[in-house]
Amino acid sequence: MMRGGMGNMNNMMKQMQKMQKQMAKAQEELGEKQVEGTAGGGMVTVIANGHKQILDVKMKEEVVDPEDIEMLQDLVLAATNDALKKAEELSNATMGQFTKGLNLPGGLF
């Protein structure tokens, strides 16, 4: 009886190590994936990766109006929030495969 228990424990440890490697690989791949957030009908675009890091900000020339800096700030903010929301969704979809069935507090993956 003890022997079977130890075998099960070893199998469980191997499965956990395998899952840990898969999670590390998925995390690494998240950093390579990119999402795009936009605002103003594409006037401002923000690129982020799956780690929620902003990689690039692009804006069309016509959106840059020295008389209305506030509008540009609002568009950059909206595009950034859109990109970060998409990065969060990507992260949840990618890492969620490892945590489904576990009752973990929100925001961990």
From Swiss-Prot:
Binds to DNA and alters its conformation. May be involved in regulation of gene expression, nucleoid organization and DNA protection. This is Nucleoid-associated protein Bcer98_0019. It comes from the Bacteria. Its main location: cytoplasm. It holds the Pfam family YbaB_DNA_bd. GO terms for molecular function: DNA binding. InterPro entries: YbaB-like_sf (IPR036894), YbaB/EbfC (IPR004401). Belongs to the YbaB/EbfC family. It is found in: Cytoplasm, Nucleoid. PANTHER family: NUCLEOID-ASSOCIATED PROTEIN YBAB (PTHR33449:SF1). GO terms for cellular component: bacterial nucleoid; cytosol. Homodimer. Keywords: Cytoplasm, DNA-binding.
